[in-house]
Amino acid sequence: MFIALKRAPRRALSPVRWLAATAAVLSSLAAPALAQAAAVNVVAAENFYGDVASQIGGRHVAVTSILSNPDQDPHLFEASPKTARALQHAQVVIYNGADYDPWMAKLLGASKQAKRVTIVVADLVGKKAGDNPHLWYDPATMPAAARAIATELGRADPANKADYDANLQKFVASLKPVDDKVAALRAQYKGVPVTATEPVFGYMSDAIGLDMRNQRFQLATMNDTEASAQDVAAFENDLRKKQVRVLIYNSQAEAPTTKRMLKIARDGGVPAVSVTETQPAGKTFQQWMAGQLDALAAALSAGKK
């Protein structure tokens, strides 16, 4: 037999209970907003440092990256009022240094804040103006940057320090496949001659042990000056006579001279590998580096034929 249960009539809440219930609802609605407001504000000059900060900070950080367009030449970037506004509420600021992003130092100097912490990656790895500024291509750089980021996030937000420390360990471990690719390339191609249009890949090339040629030409390209006729001729000769196994070119900073070198390489059967200064959208730092190393490995292998 099915017996229908009668629901007892609801009692009206007393004024005291109504106020308590309302307060509880409002408190639950406010909690997410408070949690979001408590996020540590991080501003990174370059998006690969911003990506590392996001991986270490997770849900506890709000990261803004200024240079994030892989189709833009970072050397031509000019700071805007929007850039300055992004720094107003920053608690942690990360930039490359070594004169790669001098606009950031100027902006920070113009809007000093006592509670803001600045991480200059060049200082962490002992580099200065005049050195190759493309520090993120050195396998030793990101572990150092990650440790500094985790430390400063822990100081800014002690309640979540354990999360930052754990995420730091995960990040460092996630670099092992990249390091393994570097080691494998070094074991197979150490001493192999290559060339490049610009020294973007220089530190990675050194880590692999490649013989990088035409460095004066590369510096001229990076500094937006004209390479000497002798340096241009030497570069062209290396490509035409296949004195180098691979041409590495910066696809974000193409000039008429570098485009000509790329054409000579392709016409002469020298494999070309594109590298960028800015991390592509939709990829992590690890994926970006691994993909470029895979492309280099394929080009070095093809260049032997």
Question: PLM ranges: what are they?
Answer:
Residues 2, 36-305:
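Extracytoplasmic metal-acquisition and chelation regions
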Residues 3-22:
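Bacterial N-terminal signal peptides that target proteins for export
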Residues 12, 25-26, 39:
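Intrinsically disordered, low-complexity segments
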Residues 25-35:
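C-terminal segment of classical bacterial N-terminal signal peptides
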